[in-house]
């Protein structure tokens, strides 16, 4: 009996040992860590994918440019009426000339033009270059800028879908230009817009190249190749901070007066005033090889 009991104990012990070995988790096998995907690097094409060299005469090329029309104040209490007349926007001597005039126009006492490429030149990323000479005088407010082609985000078109101000200039601050971005989270109406300024003493006497570099990770603004403002996209941003992953179109205009341009009043004796544009060129964003 004692031998039988001892045999049973030995068998039970062996069985328990085997069971523990069977239940034990497998020993992990060492593996090399998965390599991180390096961020993509980009550059811009050497040749423009869209351009206007203004090597013709007459109205701006209708295949490339449309007009915003009217005298609604444009959300900024502006004083001009925008028209599509030759007197306010014409091409001659190799340049586009946008002219603000003191004259009765619609319900307003000033006329001007606001050109846009919507539906004719809409871009997602790339580099935009505009070579221009600006008007002068208190009350003028020229701009080179972009807006969203479609309303993709939020409950209202602006500012939810973004604005990129490549160049803004106000006549009461003659030797300086500004670049800004506007989004739902960052915009001037709530005092949170992001931007910068730089001195350009000859802005109204010489031509300068105003440019925007637009990549998935940032937008950067420059004058004559000298960057003076950059706004970076971050992983924490959503569309309210960074709606700039959808197409935008270009606008060129001169406003008169308004909430910013008219802060020091409007000098009635300076008109007509013109912004001359030598060329507009848009380069495509491509991956570096």
Q: Residues of each region from the PLM?
A:
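Bacterial Sec-dependent N-terminal signal peptides
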Residues: 1-29
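GH16 jelly-roll
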Residues: 19-289
